[in-house]
Structures are given as structure tokens and as C-alpha cells.
């Protein structure tokens, strides 16, 4: 039995910091965790709980890492070397003073409710940092994820699991493609039209990896059976998110949102919408539950027929947090790579315009597609234009809060 377990590993339920705390509490050294006899009794500031000023001397109530709250002590400013923690403490203090009293001058003693708020804020920051670390440990894409909440005390969402690709539900099979292209150069010298041509469609990208098809047209990328390599210009969506993105708390009642930390060029791929693939019947059952929550995470895959739905409520990637806008900067495309079943496309977001660093990413939950000239879409004359993937399931009338000039007032 032991031999069968060699080389196996499991995820630890405790974070690195939590394990270090346990070692110090138990007075155990652990070289793997960086806890030795030399630093076992070192005191490290976990966060600051309170503040007071006596005869021009500043004091802080310090919560020490690895020690209970009852062991917190008042320390003079000169004893503390934690510049980052001190700076964040005063930033949070000033912001809350402005919110409560419309002034930012620090009092000599803090009101108990204000001190309690600062403790809760410090604990929230730790929880969000742990969540950020978990997200980055699970992501398989190049782009990093940061998390930010400067609005309220909400922490990480409960029961949400970050995934990088579809989670296939019971009774659903994703059939792998059997053949691939034989191209020497898929963009400039495609053999038989490459993978798009094999499906009687046109090549989707230019030499910069930007989509050049009209919205509503499918994208066929090269697959795992193709002769071309990783650098093939027809492999874009499958390479995953390449931009650094931030999950942030909105200040206008829209919950969490996503902003880009980098400039994104027009028509560039941004992210996929992933979640659980479930049948439409199961989606109807879950939808009745989500209705009471005002949820909009059910996304119909109705490229050719409404058979399957993507549910990103509990399993999803960063697209789970992207908000609606009636004037969005992201457009949805159906993408086919290793599975060519037209009932099960992958859902990809592309930029509709140049998006500045720091700008929020949005898509239209009730998207529509303009009519497209049939001859410009597919290579044969029997093509009937299939539409965009379905919007998140439209069940209840939800008020829109996007605030754009073209706002329709309701999501659905």
C-alpha cells in the first residue's frame, strides 16, 4: 500500500501562515516551514488592532502572529518595523473617518466601534490575500489574479471553486476530435483551409492573434491532433488568459467586478466563460433556486439548439465575477477546439475596443447579434447563420445598474 502512494500528494487544508502559527503555539521547530529554534520565539506583527496618542507618543495595539488575541500588547511606534502594515492601518483609518465623520484627522483615542472595524478590515485583508493565493495556485493561465475590496467587509465568496475548463456534468460526454490539420503554416499556407476550412468556415485571426470575424460566427482553432505546434497563430483561446486581472468590490451595489491591470487591444482574446456543463432540464431546476437569489450564472449553449447550459455559480473562473453592461467592452464568440460538437461550444470573450489599464470588463447579459451576409460567413451555400451563444438564463426581471447612457434599465 505504501509503495502505491509514493510520489502522491494532497492539498493541505491549512495555509503556510496557519501552519507556522501552529508550530509556534506548539513550540515545535519545522525547517520546511522556516521555523527553527533560532526564530521559534520571534514576534511578528499580524495586524494592528487599535491606536492611541499619549503626550505626542503614538501607541498601537499589536496582534502577534501565532498568539491569541489575549496576548496582544500596546507598543510604541518606534518599536514597530512593519512599514506596510502601519501604512495600511492609517489608510483604512482615514477612509473610515471620512465615511463616518467627513474628516480624516486621526483622534488621540479611537472609538471602540472604529477599532473593531479596523480589526475586521485587517482580518478581511488576510482572508482576501489567502483567497488570492489560492486562485493563483489553481489558475493554469499566464495572467495573474489580484483581489481588492476597499468598499465593505465582505470576504471571499463561499462555496466557489476556481476551475480552468468546463466541468462536465453527469450524463454528458465531450468527444475528442479524431483528426487535425497537416499545415506547414496555418495562417499563410493552410492545407485544405486548415481546421476552419475542414468545418467550412473561415480563419478567425490575423497575425497578431486578433479576431477578424463578425460576432455570431464560430471560431475553429487547431487542436491536439494538428501537426502545428504551440506557436501556431490559430491557437489563441486555448492558451488561456494572458492579462493580469483584478477582482474588485464595486462601490455602486453591483457586488464583485473584474478590471484589467493591462491595456487590451481591440479584438484581442480576454477570457473564457467556464463552469459546469449541465442539461437544460437540470438548468431549469437550478434556475428556480437561483431566481430567489437574483443569480445570472446560467449560460445557454444554444449555438445550434438549446440542449446544454453552463452553470458558473459554484464552479467557474474569473469570468464568474464579470458584470453586465448595456454598453460592454467584451463580445462573446463560440469556439471549437478539441470537441466539435456544435451543441457544446467553448465561450470566449474578445475586446470590442481598446480597453485601458484599470478599466472594468463587462459583457451584455442579453446580447444580440446583427444580421451578417451569408456569403461572408461560411464557404458553402447551404449555411444558415447560427447565432451567438445564449445569454445567462433570462428568468426574472432584474434591474440594471450599469449606469451607461444606453442602459436598458433591466437586464432581461
UniProtKB/Swiss-Prot annotation:
It catalyses: L-lysyl(9)-[histone H3] + 3 S-adenosyl-L-methionine = N(6),N(6),N(6)-trimethyl-L-lysyl(9)-[histone H3] + 3 S-adenosyl-L-homocysteine + 3 H(+). Gene3D superfamilies: 2.40.50.40, SET domain. InterPro entries: Chromo-like_dom_sf, Chromo/chromo_shadow_dom, Chromo_domain, Chromodomain_CS, H3-K9_MeTrfase_SUV39H1/2-like, H3K9_Histone-Lys_N-MTase, Post-SET_dom, Pre-SET_dom. Zn(2+) 3 binds at residues 186, 222, 228, 232. It is an enzyme of class 2 (transferase). S-adenosyl-L-methionine binds at residues 254-256, 297, 323-324. It comes from the Eukaryota. Residues 255-377 are annotated as: Mediates interaction with MECOM. Residues 396-412 form the Post-SET domain. Zn(2+) 1 binds at residues 181, 183, 186, 194-195. Residues 243-366 form the SET domain. Inhibited by S-adenosyl-L-homocysteine. Negatively regulated by CCAR2. PROSITE patterns: CHROMO_1, CHROMO_2, POST_SET, PRE_SET, SAM_MT43_SUVAR39_3, SET. Residues 179-240 form the Pre-SET domain. Although the SET domain contains the active site of enzymatic activity, both pre-SET and post-SET domains are required for methyltransferase activity. The SET domain also participates in stable binding to heterochromatin. In the pre-SET domain, Cys residues bind 3 zinc ions that are arranged in a triangular cluster; some of these Cys residues contribute to the binding of two zinc ions within the cluster. Interacts with H3 and H4 histones. Interacts with GFI1B, DNMT3B, CBX1, CBX4, CCAR2, MBD1, RUNX1, RUNX3, MYOD1, SMAD5 and RB1. Interacts with SBF1 through the SET domain. Interacts with HDAC1 and HDAC2 through the N-terminus and associates with the core histone deacetylase complex composed of HDAC1, HDAC2, RBBP4 and RBBP7. Component of the eNoSC complex, composed of SIRT1, SUV39H1 and RRP8. Interacts (via SET domain) with MECOM; enhances MECOM transcriptional repression activity. Interacts with LMNA; the interaction increases stability of SUV39H1. (Microbial infection) Interacts with HTLV-1 Tax protein, leading to abrogate Tax transactivation of HTLV-1 LTR. Belongs to the class V-like SAM-binding methyltransferase superfamily. Histone-lysine methyltransferase family. Suvar3-9 subfamily. This is Histone-lysine N-methyltransferase SUV39H1. The gene is SUV39H1.
